[in-house]
């Protein structure tokens, strides 16, 4: 995928949301590129970048120009041989408010994230922003209630999950429904258990397996906002 084109399209979406009054904008997991973790390929490490780096500068300028807080999800090159799946929160003035490095790393067929990412070392600490204290987690973290609880205990005002999850092409309709409902239910449960709103933002659409070993992933979208009683607002 053309990363420059992707970032341009993301910027267009961010600008549109800001015009419609959004103050907090959350992007999906690893949004700059295709979900490269479908395969184990050393060439994909070329997608990684430092933080701060080109992407934080790009989204920082958008945040400052539009007066919005942006939650990004980046492939961080921290040091030679050390890489993370990192959410970076950009404040309204364009500065980095904080970051969270994904702690729970999957290693399932078509989700070979352990090949790329070292588990985070920043703990579960909410990020203070002008729109509140954001408990930012990433995708697979959503299956673990402890992550949500630790963020809540540290004073988070809202739980946020940039995500990349989808169906295998061979899943039956019944299995697809079970998976999607489990995904929604577990995060609505985090909202109820902790008395906090939850925002989940997922990829959407089909992405082929570049290696041809599998039939690709159909990312199911279904992004939502739930209130503190698990009620769906969006």
Describe these PLM feature segments:
Residues 1-2, 6, 86, 99-102, ...:
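Active-site-proximal beta-strand elements of phosphoester/diester hydrolases
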Residues 3, 12-92, 99, 165-196:
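Cys-nucleophile CN-hydrolase/nitrilase-fold catalytic domain and related Cys-dependent amidase chemistry
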Residues 5-15, 144-151:
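Short, acidic/polar
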Residues 48-71, 133, 139-234:
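CN hydrolase (nitrilase-like) catalytic-core segments centered on the catalytic cysteine
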Residues 75-77, 102-105, 139, 203-204:
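Active-site beta-loop-alpha junctions enriched in small/polar residues
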Residues 82-102, 216-234:
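Amphipathic beta-strand/beta-sheet edge segments enriched in Tyr/Trp
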Residues 102-116:
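A short, polar/charged loop-to-alpha-helix boundary motif
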Residues 117-131:
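Glycine-/acidic-rich phosphate or pyrophosphate-binding loops and their flanking alpha/beta elements
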């Amino acid at each position: 995928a053309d990363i420059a084109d992707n970032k341009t399209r993301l910027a267009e979406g961010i600008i549109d949301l800001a015009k419609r009054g959004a103050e907090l904008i959350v992007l999906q997991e690893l949004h700059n590129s295709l979900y490269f973790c479908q395969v184990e390929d050393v060439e994909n490490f070329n997608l990684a970048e430092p933080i701060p780096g080109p992407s934080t500068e790009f989204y920082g300028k958008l945040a400052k120009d539009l007066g919005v807080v942006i939650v990004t999800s980046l492939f961080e090159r921290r040091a030679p041989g050390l890489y993370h799946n990192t959410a970076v929160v950009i404040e309204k003035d364009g500065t980095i408010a904080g970051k969270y490095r994904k702690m729970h790393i999957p290693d399932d067929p078509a989700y070979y994230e352990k090949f790329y990412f070292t588990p985070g070392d920043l703990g579960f600490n909410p990020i203070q922003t002008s729109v509140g204290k954001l408990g930012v987690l990433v995708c697979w973290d959503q299956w673990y209630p402890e992550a949500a609880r630790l963020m809540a205990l540290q004073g988070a005002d809202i739980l946020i999950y940039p995500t990349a999850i989808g169906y295998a092409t061979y899943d039956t309709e019944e299995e697809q429904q079970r998976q999607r409902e489990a995904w929604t239910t577990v995060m609505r449960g985090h909202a109820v258990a902790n008395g906090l709103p939850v925002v989940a933002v997922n990829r959407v659409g089909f992405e082929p397996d570049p290696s041809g070993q599998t039939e690709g992933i159909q990312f199911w979208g279904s992004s939502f906002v739930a209130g503190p009683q698990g009620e769906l607002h969006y």
